[in-house]
Amino acid sequence: METKPYLIALDLDGTLLKDDKTISENTLHTIQRLKDDGHYVCISTGRPYRSSSMYYQQMELTTPIVNFNGAFVHHPQDDSWGRYHTSLPLDVVKQLVDISESYNVHNVLAEVIDDVYFHYHDEHLIDAFNMNTTNVTVGDLRENLGEDVTSVLIHAKEEDVPAIRSYLSDVHAEVIDHRRWAAPWHVIEIIKSGMNKAVGLQKISDYYGVPRERIIAFGDEDNDLEMLEFAGCGVAMGNGIDAVKQIANRTTATNEEDGVARFLKEYFSL
């Protein structure tokens, strides 16, 4: 058994979670054994905290968490740890709304940590994003937003996504980073330039004094690339995109096949 503690970073969707958005009993049991052995387990996700807290609680974690792909990092159980919030300037957000309107997009959402602003009313999106328990404001973002935001989501027509992303790269490359969500959502997610999961993971590893060679990170999508590269052992899911598998040190089974648990059991001889 390993005696020095490892830091194990888990993406949620397509990685830790099965397709039905649950954690298998096998995976829960494996994570508990690693925690009992003194290892640190953390979540590193593109989701906001409000839609990842249930998994944090289910796994009974006691570590900081990375949300919004690194734009928000905090410790849910220790306010003194600090809150690292890297936001998008409000003037840039207003420009993003302008360009979105010119493409007649379905909607634009702005998130300020756990408050959500919709440019247009959209019951379907509110339900899909599980926002019924969230502070939701509907109306022109240029009027309703009074502070810098954590992230912007542009829900566009599929055929317009490449053109909008090209514009973002041409005009705002120094200020923002943008990614396209996996199907079926034709959503462009925008955060402050330079933010990624590795930035958040480094804050956590520094806090615990765990060197990179004792960090294991799991992921499946392009927002996991930097984190897998940062970790001493980056593990791609079997269902991951090719770019993730190419950059990873190892590839495990799919999220439906308990890929996380299978790798960890083998690695730590559980």
Swiss-Prot record:
- Keyword Metal-binding in record: yes
One biological process GO term for this chain? riboflavin biosynthetic process
Reactions the enzyme catalyzes: 5-amino-6-(5-phospho-D-ribitylamino)uracil + H2O = 5-amino-6-(D-ribitylamino)uracil + phosphate
Listed under GO cellular component are: cytosol
A Pfam cross-reference name = Hydrolase_3
Q: Could you tell me which InterPro entries the record lists for this protein?
A: Cof, HAD-like_sf, HAD-SF_hydro_IIB, HAD_sf
Q: Which cysteines are joined by disulfide bonds?
A: none
Cofactors (names): Mg(2+)
GO molecular-function annotation terms? 5-amino-6-(5-phosphoribitylamino)uracil phosphatase activity; magnesium ion binding; phosphatase activity
- Pathway recorded for this protein: Cofactor biosynthesis; riboflavin biosynthesis; 5-amino-6-(D-ribitylamino)uracil from GTP: step 4/4
Q: Which residues form the signal peptide?
A: none
Identify the EC number(s).
3.1.3.104
> Which annotated residues bind phosphate?
L12, T45, G46, K197, N223
UniProt entry keywords in alphabetical sequence: Hydrolase, Magnesium, Metal-binding, Riboflavin biosynthesis
Q: Which residues constitute the catalytic centre?
A: D11
Q: What class of enzyme is it?
A: hydrolase
Which residues of the sequence carry a binding annotation for Mg(2+)? Answer: D11, D13, D220
Q: What does this protein's UniProt record list under function?
A: Catalyzes the dephosphorylation of the riboflavin precursor 5-amino-6-(5-phospho-D-ribitylamino)uracil and of flavin mononucleotide (FMN) in vitro.
Q: Which family does it belong to?
A: Belongs to the HAD-like hydrolase superfamily. Cof family.
Q: Which PANTHER family match?
A: 5-AMINO-6-(5-PHOSPHO-D-RIBITYLAMINO)URACIL PHOSPHATASE YITU (PTHR10000:SF23), PHOSPHOSERINE PHOSPHATASE (PTHR10000)
Q: What is this protein called?
A: 5-amino-6-(5-phospho-D-ribitylamino)uracil phosphatase YitU
Q: What organism does the UniProt record list as the source?
A: Bacillus subtilis (strain 168)
